[in-house]
Curated annotation (Swiss-Prot):
Gene of this entry: Tnnt2
One Pfam match: Troponin
Organism from which the protein derives: Mus musculus (Mouse)
Modified residues (Phosphothreonine): 207, 216, 297
Start-end of Basic and acidic residues biased regions: 125-186, 206-224
Coiled-coil boundaries: none
GO CC annotation, single: striated muscle thin filament
Protein name, UniProt field: Troponin T, cardiac muscle
Extent of Acidic residues compositional bias: 1-72
Segments for region (Disordered): 1-97, 125-224
Molecular function via GO: actin binding; structural constituent of cytoskeleton; tropomyosin binding; troponin C binding; troponin I binding
PANTHER family the UniProt entry points to: TROPONIN T, TROPONIN T, CARDIAC MUSCLE
Positions where Phosphoserine occurs in the chain: 2, 211
Domain of life, source organism: Eukaryota
Lineage, uppermost ranks: Eukaryota, Metazoa, Chordata, Craniata, Vertebrata
Length: 301
């Protein structure tokens, strides 16, 4: 039951008690009036006695007249005595008296105490909510700082990985270029050995080596590689630009692999042609030697 309903019920009870007390007061007043009326009733009896004395004083002549006239009906009403019981209001014992002011005061104090309790509970809940909100903000800030630190460490690791990949790529390219240079040198040496045009080609190769032509070619290759190999500057790029840069690098790697495959196939074809030419040269040399011996033997015969 709510406080409003309790207050309404108490108010109705107070009204009923007031009505009851008013009814008791009315009954007491009526009882007092009836008692006063009962004390005033003997006066008609005295009047009746005087009337009887007057009747007795009347002479016998009048009685004779009355006897001659015969009985006459008495039309006057006889006075009737009313019996009114004495109504005494019930008395309330002293121990059962109800003090409505005290009840009202206690009710007001109870309401005030409940209101004070509700206010204190409200402020306690509000204080708890504020503390929880502050702790939640602290946790959010702490988590945000941890994420920023993790992101910074991740970026540093990614940067180091990119640097290692770039260094590894540069090292592989340098080794590949060195290997290609050695292969070309071996091919040139093989070609020079296959060509038996006297010592002209060998001398020319020696003079070229002495003149530093190989060093010049190496420098040219280094220059070309330096032009092709560009610095990887990705610190200022965002996520979309990094994706574009990755696609561009992947495309360049794809092109290099395709070019490498073409060069390998070309190298295989050249190697095959060199072997064919070497076999032909060997066959021709064998044929020329046998012919020379046959001519010499025939001439001596």
């Amino acid at each position: 039951m709510s406080d409003a309903e309790e207050v309404v019920e108490e108010y109705e009870e107070e009204q009923e008690e007031e009505d009851w007390s008013e009814e008791e007061e009315d009954e007491q007043e009526e009882a007092v009036e009836e008692e006063e009326a009962g004390g005033a009733e003997p006066e008609p009896e005295g009047e009746a006695e005087t009337e009887e004395a007057n009747v007795e004083e009347v002479g016998p002549d009048e009685e004779a007249k009355d006897a001659e006239e015969g009985p006459v009906e008495d039309t006057k009403p006889k006075p009737s005595r009313l019996f009114m019981p004495n109504l005494v209001p019930p008395k309330i014992p002293d121990g059962e008296r109800v003090d409505f002011d005290d009840i009202h005061r206690k009710r007001v104090e109870k309401d005030l105490n409940e209101l004070q309790t509700l206010i204190e509970a409200h402020f306690e809940n509000r204080k708890k909510e504020e503390e929880e909100l502050i702790s939640l903000k602290d946790r959010i800030e702490k988590r945000r700082a941890e994420r920023a630190e993790q992101q910074r460490i991740r970026n540093e690791r990614e940067k180091e990985r990119q640097n290692r990949l770039a260094e590894e790529r540069a090292r592989r390219e340098e080794e590949e270029n060195r290997r290609k240079a050695e292969d070309e040198a071996r091919k040139k040496k093989a070609l020079s050995n296959m060509m038996h045009f006297g010592g002209y080609i060998q001398k020319q190769a020696q003079t070229e080596r002495k003149s530093g032509k190989r060093q010049t070619e190496r420098e040219k290759k280094k220059k070309i590689l330096a032009e092709r190999r560009k610095a990887l500057a990705i610190d200022h790029l965002n996520e979309d630009q990094l994706r574009e840069k990755a696609k561009e690098l992947w495309q360049s790697i794809h092109n290099l692999e395709a070019e490498k495959f073409d060069l390998q196939e070309k190298f295989k074809q050249q190697k095959y042609e060199i072997n064919v030419l070497r076999n032909r040269i060997n066959d021709n040399q064998k044929v020329s030697k046998t012919r020379g011996k046959a001519k010499v033997t025939g001439r001596w015969k």
